Amino acid sequence: MGQKVNPIGMRLQVNRTWDSRWFAESKDYGNLLLEDLKMREFIHDYAKQAGVSKVIIERPHRKCRVTIHTARPGVIIGKKGADIETLRKKLAAFTKSELHLNIVEIRKPELDAQLVAESIAQQMERRVSFRRAMKRGVQNAMRIGALGIRVNVAGRLGGAEIARTEWYREGRVPLHTLRADIDYATSEASTPYGIIGVKVWIFKGEILEHDPQAHDRRHSEAQEGAAPRPPRRDRERA
């Protein structure tokens, strides 16, 4: 089953957590969830050139805190912070809560599955060979420090009449192992022959402790250049 389900959804509350981190009453839940979807869609369209990986939305009391993880923060911030103020005003129109906007830089985009998938899709839209784009993404990830990566592309590859699926893998990608820290993302390439789907799995190691925040903490430490914390072995204490 590990190969059939979404790797992130399978690991929620094990070593991953949600991108929308708030609780609401039943009468308000639908409206707030719709706000999240609209804000995420707007951010990805507005900052398409900034390399946005994910958008974390938290809702403390009567506030809305939006954190954008991007590979090019300067594109969003703009000269003297002019662009980020414009973005904040546009996002404020989606919610009635007080909006706070934070920008987090991704210093190793080669290890981010969303950015790798979008990079491969953009290369195919520029008519780069899909095999070359896949191999380049895999080699860059392994060179930076990934323990394994798998890339799937599906569609009318190379303009073929019949759609097919091809994949490329290097290293280990243990999808059945719940403690495995696996980043997963999808993207689409719009070509003259139709849409080509891209899927990327990146294996970064194992998280032995049961902590939903472990992936985010490990990711932030890796981006800052600090050594990851050693895993806590609860069984050895017993």
From Swiss-Prot:
The keyword Ribosomal protein applies. Residues 212-238 are annotated as: Disordered. It comes from the Bacteria. Residues 212-222 have a biased composition (Basic and acidic residues). Signal peptide: none annotated. It holds the Pfam family Ribosomal_S3_C. Keywords: Ribonucleoprotein, Ribosomal protein, RNA-binding, rRNA-binding. GO terms for molecular function: mRNA binding; rRNA binding; structural constituent of ribosome. One of its GO terms (biological process) is translation. GO terms for cellular component: cytosolic small ribosomal subunit. The keyword Heme does not apply. Residues 39-107 form the KH type-2 domain. Binds the lower part of the 30S subunit head. Binds mRNA in the 70S ribosome, positioning it for translation. Part of the 30S ribosomal subunit. Forms a tight complex with proteins S10 and S14. NCBIfam families: rpsC_bact (TIGR01009). Belongs to the universal ribosomal protein uS3 family. This is Small ribosomal subunit protein uS3.
